Amino acid sequence: MDYIILDIEFNGRKFASDLPMEVIEIGAVRLNEQLQLIDQFSALIKPVYFAKLNKFIQKKTGILQTEIDEAERFPKVINDFQQWLAQSESCLFITWGGEDMKRIVLDTRMHRLDDQYFLHADYFDLLKGFIKHKGLVNDISVENALVELQIEADGHAHRALDDARMTSEIFKATFEHLDFSQIQQYKDSFTNAKERRLIKNAIRLLLSQKLEPTWPMFEEHFLQKTIKTDNPKKTAEIKQYFLEQMTKQKNDKTTD
């Protein structure tokens, strides 16, 4: 089995917008079972929306507008990428966090392409693995993880291929300490971290006031005021998360 260390860059925006963010660069390296680098993939992508990169993204990535203007669109690049992936009889994706798989799935859907390959692809979140191995509390960047491991960074941070290479060095250095029972597949999520934090805080507030946190109460006093729920799937996910967190916090309070 090969290991595909994946990194993507996407077009962030300074101001909020209803238009989707898009992948603008895919970088990946292929390691064999002996953790030797045997191949690599790199491609820029010309976005449909925000085709003109803002100054923040240009400064962060070093990607030039002329390079983006000359790049292929997502359907061509993702097809090339899947052909490159097919050279491995089997593979496990290694990512730093869960955003890379999410953005590829979302862009695949945006372009009305078949998303089944990436939905069923196994991946290991090296960020979580590294945090568990080192006993850390907060997330850490690839650059700081390299410092922690006393590995000299080689490349330009926030360029997909260079980040994939640097992530592969972390993977190799920590391989024997990683818990591969945590391999997962992409799961659709309609809420973000901020919204899930609001839910937990609301339950905590209700409990502190000696009130029973019920879904109707949360829906009336918190949900309608703080979270946009025009998607029924999102509402269902919020309700499920609320019920899980309510049970967890009540149990924690009982055992205190």
What would you call each of these model-derived segments?
Residues 63-67:
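Short glycine/proline- and acidic residue-enriched helix-loop micro-motifs
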Residues 1-61:
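Conserved RNase H-like, two-metal-ion catalytic cores of nucleic-acid enzymes
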Residues 1-19, 33-36, 69-92, 97-256:
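DEDD superfamily 3′-5′ metal-dependent exonuclease/proofreading module
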